[in-house]
Regions:
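Carbohydrate-interacting regions of secretory-pathway proteins
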Residues: 1-203
Length: 203
């Protein structure tokens, strides 16, 4: 179906202002997923089941990692600031499952001031930060980013290419990823919160 987008002003109405109007056309794969329901949750909202440190066992019913860098509570997976006495500065938490089929990964994140984290897509990292402060420069220009508020990232993986958007605004049109691998979250600097992590494999 085809059609136009329109804006209407009724007679006698006050001035109405719009801004940041854009439209993103979906590829066939993404459209198929959006019309086929939500994906499977990667995070149960209560524990770190289904996640692990590399070469370690599934964290199972634990509500936090052994070094305290990751914790689960009330629907939020939190990446916590480092405690130098407990472990290394950089950490990565991985799904125990790997993904070879095309998929759509969706999640919400809320960054603390100057926070630096990342989302690993089959092993390759998409930066997830307090973009307004921590960049990188390419992402400082993102108009839709809401500092210290919830933002939504959607990643559509087709083959070895990922289309990544922030609140509907394109971050990466063709981000290169491996053919197979897990999803990961990085702990680098500051506090980062994630929620509503879901992955829908494309038929």
């Amino acid at each position: 179906m085809r059609g136009k987008i329109g804006l209407q002003l009724h007679k006698g109405a006050k001035v109405i202002r719009y801004r940041n109007l854009w439209i993103e056309e979906l590829g066939a794969a993404a459209a198929t997923v959006k019309n086929s329901g939500s994906g499977a949750a990667l995070f149960d909202g209560r524990t770190l089941a289904g996640w692990h440190y590399q070469d370690e066992a599934d964290l199972g019913s634990a509500t936090q990692s052994t070094d305290g860098r990751y914790s689960a509570k009330e629907g939020v997976l939190t990446v916590n600031p480092e405690d130098k006495a407990k472990g290394p500065h950089l950490r990565q938490l991985w799904t125990t499952r790997e993904f070879a089929r095309d998929f759509v990964l969706s999640l919400d994140f809320r960054a603390g001031v100057d926070a630096d984290s990342g989302i690993f897509i089959r092993g390759n990292q998409l930066q997830c930060r307090d973009f307004a402060v921590a960049g990188p420069p390419k992402y400082k220009a993102l108009k839709s980013y809401r500092p210290q508020d919830w933002n939504r990232i959607e990643i559509v993986v087709t083959g070895t290419s990922a289309r990544c958007t922030l609140n509907g605004e394109v971050m990466e049109a063709a981000f290169k990823v491996p053919a197979n691998g897990p999803i990961g979250l990085e702990a680098d600097r500051g506090t980062m919160e994630y929620r509503n992590l879901s992955l829908k494999e494309i038929p």
